[in-house]
């Protein structure tokens, strides 16, 4: 009798366990290497495998709306699997003219009008929430995003203790095991490395009417999400800032009740996979501008960094028409498409219509038109917000684009500001470049008159911009979209010798390094930061820089090690450009690079570090050689060095 009772008890226990066991749904990438396991039980959580390696473990997903929370014992209604197989042709292609979008998708629907899409790509994963609440508006109080790792991973992050910042922090490199709950938060993108060396790049795309995500350590070998609240009221602060006077209790207020939230994505693979990915592109929405023929990416001579410093002329240089006509002349000589009038061209930052006495914008636009050079204007975001009529005013004058600066926030209101301004500029065929900005997150794909974003510790910071930090950019910031780094210093120095001042700036790294940045870094609007006079005196270097396209048909990552070196080849038409950079290292870098991507023989013109560039950074050597698809190039880079060339 006791045995029978024991048997009954055991059967009942196993039955309860079976009832309590979570349901697991799995989806794999087209090549089968990436696998997502979604567990639906008391919580909704997912894990990710790269082959047999677990890279993300039990990440819990929640969504807190007003008077409703999703994620506690979610009740699955349906599971639909589909295949994504399409090609995307970006209007402003940063790496590829044709981008394949191939993935397997699993769409889960739950009771309560909530769904989650999961996508498995050959090079990573993505997911997003779907809300189906009908016509009513929804307040999102919080979205729960987790990144949990099965072991200590190296984290490469940008720490911040405030949401009000321009995303220009240096990278910190630390094990997840050393991070404690309550430590500073980090903004995206963020890069992780597993004990096996697998890289995981985390970011987001298709962010609309919603804040950007920040992450904070959870003290358990991982991160959890944290978002800026949605502003309810604010007031101006000075000529370029704002003070949020009242915040709502939610991160996203009054959003459509039938919509998708942003894609969260993780690119997974080796260093080359990370640097070559197009995840932000394929997850963004399609282009929303019918006629894009007027959108012309290009290079621009920039005035602010070199402090309007030109010499050997018969006029007083500064912020005046004579200086800008000189800049236009130099731009025209080298085939640079644009010049920029940065801060200082108007009498007051607050007044976009009254120029200083020495500036006549219409005269400069007309002069530039004769020379084949377009004009861009710098403006504070606050000025644009208060004077939206400046957009048709300067468009009618013939200005080509606006550099809009100092947003320094990524809450719901500011995300909407970006889109509102870019849409308004598109109506009048004006292009846009955002400085003091957050990272790309899809808007530039939908509205491609947005050519670039800053959101990077770039050359603007002079000695604060060191190659040891910048060598991470192809694997982090520039791996998620256009990056206005503002390269091009001709006064070059190794970091210990970088004594540049505001009026006589210097650039860290060798001359060949600064030149190679034009091939290695990607931006629809690429600055030439140094003095036009220096570019004239360094004409053979300038001729190469000005020949580098800002958009590309194809990209090949030839050699890559995050934090150490990056070598890339990019094709425009029938020409291949090759760029290589390295950071601070104890020994020179020697690499053998195959040119097997060539389809026919050609002539290579190249620039490399000079014999003494490890000490005297301006030292470089120019060379030429015949090459074929069988050629093996020998690259030699000094510390903080570079190599660049073009095959014609």
Locations of regions flagged by a protein language model:
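Bacterial N-terminal signal peptides
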Residues: 8-15
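C-terminal beta-strand-rich structural cap/linker in extracellular carbohydrate-active enzymes
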Residues: 624-648
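N-terminal accessory beta-strand-rich subdomains and adjacent acidic, glycine-rich linkers
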Residues: 22-282
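Edge strands and adjacent loops of beta-rich recognition modules
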Residues: 94-100, 544-568
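Carbohydrate-binding surface patches
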Residues: 561-599, 643-644
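An acidic-aromatic substrate-binding cleft motif
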Residues: 252, 256-330, 334
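Catalytic cores of secreted or luminal carbohydrate-active enzymes
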Residues: 512, 516-558
């Amino acid at each position: 009798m006791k045995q029978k009772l024991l048997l009954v008890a055991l059967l009942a226990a196993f039955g309860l366990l079976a009832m309590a066991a979570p349901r697991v749904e799995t989806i794999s990438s087209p090549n089968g290497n990436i696998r997502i396991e979604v567990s639906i039980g008391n919580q909704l959580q997912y894990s990710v495998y790269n082959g047999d390696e677990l890279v993300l473990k039990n990440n819990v997903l929640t969504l807190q709306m007003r008077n409703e929370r999703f994620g506690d014992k979610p009740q699955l209604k349906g599971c639909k699997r589909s295949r994504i197989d399409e090609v995307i042709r970006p209007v402003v292609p940063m790496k590829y003219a044709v981008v394949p979008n191939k993935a397997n998708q699993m769409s889960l629907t739950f009771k309560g009008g909530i769904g989650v899409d999961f996508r498995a790509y050959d090079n990573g994963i993505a997911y997003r929430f779907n809300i189906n609440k009908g016509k009513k508006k929804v307040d999102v109080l919080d979205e729960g995003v987790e990144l949990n790792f099965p072991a200590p991973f190296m984290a490469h992050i940008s720490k911040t203790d405030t949401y009000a910042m321009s995303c220009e922090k240096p990278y910190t490199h630390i094990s997840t095991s050393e991070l404690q709950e309550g430590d500073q938060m980090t903004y995206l993108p963020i890069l992780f490395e597993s004990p096996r060396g697998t890289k995981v790049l985390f970011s987001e795309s298709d962010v609309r009417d919603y804040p950007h995500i920040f992450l904070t350590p959870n003290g358990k070998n991982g991160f959890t999400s944290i978002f800026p609240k949605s502003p309810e009221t604010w007031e101006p602060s000075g000529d370029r800032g704002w003070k949020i006077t009242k915040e709502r209790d939610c991160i996203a207020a009054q959003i459509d009740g039938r919509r998708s939230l942003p894609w969260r994505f993780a690119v997974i693979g080796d260093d080359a996979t990370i640097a070559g990915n197009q995840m932000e592109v394929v997850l963004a929405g399609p282009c929303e501008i019918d006629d894009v023929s007027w959108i012309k990416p290009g290079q621009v001579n920039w005035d602010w960094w070199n402090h309007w410093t030109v010499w050997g002329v018969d006029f007083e240089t500064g912020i005046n028409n004579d200086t800008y006509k000189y800049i236009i002349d130099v731009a025209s000589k080298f085939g640079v498409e644009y010049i920029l009038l940065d801060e200082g061209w108007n009498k007051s930052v607050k007044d976009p219509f009254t120029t200083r006495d020495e500036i006549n914008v219409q005269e400069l636009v007309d002069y530039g038109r004769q020379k084949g050079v377009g004009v861009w204007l710098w403006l504070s975001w606050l000025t644009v917000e208060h004077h939206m009529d400046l957009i048709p005013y300067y468009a009618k004058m013939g200005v080509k684009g606006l550099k809009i600066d100092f947003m320094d926030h990524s809450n719901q209101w500011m995300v909407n500001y970006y889109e509102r301004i870019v849409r308004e500029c598109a109506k009048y065929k004006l292009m846009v470049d955002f400085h003091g900005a957050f990272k790309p997150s899809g808007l530039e794909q939908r509205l491609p008159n947005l050519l670039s974003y800053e959101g990077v510790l770039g050359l603007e910071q002079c000695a604060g911009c060191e190659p040891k930090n910048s060598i991470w950019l192809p694997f982090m910031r520039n791996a998620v979209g256009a990056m206005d780094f503002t390269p091009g210093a001709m006064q070059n120095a190794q970091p210990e010798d970088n004594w540049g001042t505001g009026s006589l700036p210097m650039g860290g790294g060798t001359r060949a390094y600064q030149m190679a940045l034009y091939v290695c870094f990607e931006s629809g609007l690429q600055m030439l930061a140094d003095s036009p006079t220096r570019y004239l005196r360094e004409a053979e270097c300038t001729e190469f820089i000005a020949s580098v396209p800002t958009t590309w048909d194809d990209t090949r990552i030839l050699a890559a090690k995050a934090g150490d070196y990056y070598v890339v080849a990019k094709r425009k038409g029938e020409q291949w450009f090759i760029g290589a950079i390295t950071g601070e290292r104890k020994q020179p870098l020697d690499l053998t690079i195959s040119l097997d991507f060539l389809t026919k023989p050609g002539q290579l013109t190249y620039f490399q570090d000079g014999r003494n560039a490890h000490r005297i950074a301006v030292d470089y050597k120019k060379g030429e050689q015949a090459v074929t698809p069988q050629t093996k190039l020998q690259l030699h880079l000094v510390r903080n060095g570079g190599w660049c060339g073009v095959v014609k």
